[in-house]
Each structure stands twice: as structure tokens, then as C-alpha cells.
């Protein structure tokens, strides 16, 4: 028998110390990684609940194990809320991650060797959209589209590639593209060549849920997303679709038993909470502020002479090219880290450096917006970053910025009383 009083602090001091240090880091550092956010205490509570004890292979009402009557309720709540949130007819809440959701889509609708047309990783796409190092680039014939000299997707070029290569599936989505995707145009191109349209909205799902970014569900054959990032839930995946019995059956089979075994019902419960939070009016205000904050930061960088890829942002993220300054993303990342500002190095178009070094930084505002930053704080923050980038080896500047970061983080904590 377990005692409910046996906490991690009492049982495993070493692990507890590391967890406490991470909690302190999150409170004292400014988080600007575009794919990161902070979950609510309710989301974390669900993930640490008794639901972690239950195996539930199958789907609600059709399980391979007994004793699933209550986890069926949990999973159905998550399904129903996801469908309501995104206006979908179908939702599968079982994928353990976004990459696994994407793999399940490919497994459901493609055969090995089929051609897919996705956005190049070097131009802002994602590993799972056909990158050579990913299974999506190894199992399928991956053709890649990119951005033009203005940093924008050239839809005429996408159409030309589609007509030339006749893909079985067109993938629309990104990990580092700051503009609005034209879903009707993608649909038009897919229809022209008889391809499935698959949209990976992992980065913008929260914006979509709040109505501040176009919803791909009415246009795509299938949509995937993560449930963290802008959606601000647990780490996990989600698949959505319009009504299509054949596609729904294939997707369900591809997730289980095709790609996964038992679902993580404690994480699915956390997803249900996340979807409920996203259905509240205040979530729309939060997402609107996320975009305003990203735009405010980008404007400061442009005014200070830095190159923002695509000339600005219309979502939660943007790429900063440091080619002109001859600064590597790796060095910039390290210098900002000393000042308690967390970013990630990122390749930029026509990057002369390797993906392990890069010539750019990716910025995102979901996390700072969660802790209460508005345009004024984000402009000030962008200015501090510019000061460091202007002289990476100036320890006095880094020290001064770090003190400012600690002060603003104390003023705007992640988790209040």
C-alpha cells in the first residue's frame, strides 16, 4: 500500500532538487522558444493523477481491457471538446506527440514510396514534412517547396511542383514561418492534382482555436497539431478531420494499433482541461496578445537594423537572420542564455552555416504572454536582446540585462500565489 504522504521531496531528494531547480529556472528566465509555453496547474494535476495507472487499448466503448468505464468518460470529454474547439467532425486525442500524429496520418493515407510535397526544413518547415533525416523523408518520395526572396511561400511554385510531381499528399504547415498560410489556395492546388491536403497546425493551434488565425479544418482532408505550444496544454498530439467515414477508420487504425499501443489517459485528461481552457473568452484575449507581442518585438529588431525573415510576423513567431551581422545562432543563443533569456538557434534561408551552428534565432511569444508581458515589456525585452547582439562578448552588458530580466520576472511570475 502506498502512502499519499510519500512525496518526491521525501523519497528522492536528488530528483526533487533537479525539479526545484527547473522550477526556479522557469520563474527567473524569460522563455522565448516559440514551441514552449507554461501549462496551468490543472493540466499538471491531471498528468499526475491516478489515470496514469490505467491501460486502455482501443477507443471509448471498444476497449481491449476491462475497467475502462471511467477513462472512457475522460477520453470522450477530450474528443468532444476538441471537435467543438476546432469545428471538426472527427478527433483522435490519443497521439503521444505531434510527430506521432503526423506519422499516423502518413500510415493511414499513404503507401511506402508515395510522393509527398511539403515545406523544406531549411525554409521553415518541419522534420516530419519530408526532411531527409526523418522517416517521412525515408519512407516516402519527398518533394520540397520553400519561400521566395521576400520570405513568402510562392503558391504558384507550389502548384508547379504539384503538377510536375503529382504528389499523393500535400503538406501545409511549418515550424518557423511567420505569415498566414493560404489554406484555400492549398486546397485548390491539391484538388488540381488529386492529392490529399494534410495541414500540420502545431504551431498555431492556439491562435486557430481563438479565431485569430484561419482554421484549416474546413479545407484539409486531415489536420494535426500538438497540444502544447500556443494551445498551452500538455505535451501530446491531436488529429482532426471533417466527416469522412473512410478516412476516420483509417486514421483510428493508424494510431492504434498502427503506430501506438495503449493511450496515455492521464495526458488525455490534461488535453481535456486544455481544450476547456481554450473554449473560454479569456483565451481569445490571450492569443490576440501573443500576436501583438510578437509584432512589437519584430518591429524593434527591424528598427535596430536586424533582418526579420518575411519582413515581420502575423502569428506568434519570427526568425531573425544574423547573416548581415556575421553572428552565428549558436553564439547568440549562448550569450542570451547568460542573460537568462532562452531562445533557440535556427537556420535561415540561404544559411551559410550548418544546422548545428546556424545564422539565425527563432523567437516566439506564447510563454512571455502567459506570464503577463504586453507590448511595452516585449519592446523593452527586444531592446535588451539587441544590446547583447550588438556586442556578444560584452559581459557588462550581459550582466546588466540579466539583472533587468530577473527584476521583470519577479514582477510577472509564471505561477502566482
Curated annotation (Swiss-Prot):
Q: Which GO terms describe its molecular function?
A: glycine hydroxymethyltransferase activity; pyridoxal phosphate binding
Q: Which cofactor does it need?
A: pyridoxal 5'-phosphate
Q: Which GO terms describe its biological process?
A: glycine biosynthetic process from serine; tetrahydrofolate interconversion
Record site: Plays an important role in substrate specificity:
228
> So which domain of life are we looking at?
Bacteria
Q: List localization entries.
A: Cytoplasm
Where on this chain does (6S)-5,6,7,8-tetrahydrofolate bind?
A: 121, 125-127, 354-356
As its record notes, the protein acts as a catalyst of: (6R)-5,10-methylene-5,6,7,8-tetrahydrofolate + glycine + H2O = (6S)-5,6,7,8-tetrahydrofolate + L-serine
Q: Which UniProt keywords apply?
A: Amino-acid biosynthesis, Cytoplasm, One-carbon metabolism, Pyridoxal phosphate, Transferase
Any single GO CC term annotated in Swiss-Prot or TrEMBL for this entry: cytosol
Q: What is its EC number?
A: 2.1.2.1
Which residues are reported to carry the modification N6-(pyridoxal phosphate)lysine? 229
What pathway, per the record? One-carbon metabolism; tetrahydrofolate interconversion; Amino-acid biosynthesis; glycine biosynthesis; glycine from L-serine: step 1/1
InterPro entries assigned to the protein according to its UniProt record, in alphabetical order = PyrdxlP-dep_Trfase (IPR015424), PyrdxlP-dep_Trfase_major (IPR015421), PyrdxlP-dep_Trfase_small (IPR015422), Ser_HO-MeTrfase (IPR001085), Ser_HO-MeTrfase-like (IPR049943), Ser_HO-MeTrfase_PLP_BS (IPR019798), SHMT-like_dom (IPR039429)
What Gene3D superfamilies does the record point to? Aspartate Aminotransferase, domain 1 (3.90.1150.10), Type I PLP-dependent aspartate aminotransferase-like (Major domain) (3.40.640.10)
CDD domains the UniProt entry points to: SHMT
Q: What is its main location?
A: cytoplasm
Fill in the subunit field for this protein.
Homodimer.
Q: What NCBIfam families does the record point to?
A: PRK00011.1 (NF000586)
What job does the chain carry out?
Answer: Catalyzes the reversible interconversion of serine and glycine with tetrahydrofolate (THF) serving as the one-carbon carrier. This reaction serves as the major source of one-carbon groups required for the biosynthesis of purines, thymidylate, methionine, and other important biomolecules. Also exhibits THF-independent aldolase activity toward beta-hydroxyamino acids, producing glycine and aldehydes, via a retro-aldol mechanism.
Q: Which HAMAP family match?
A: SHMT (MF_00051)
Put simply, this protein is called Serine hydroxymethyltransferase 1
Q: Which gene encodes it?
A: glyA1
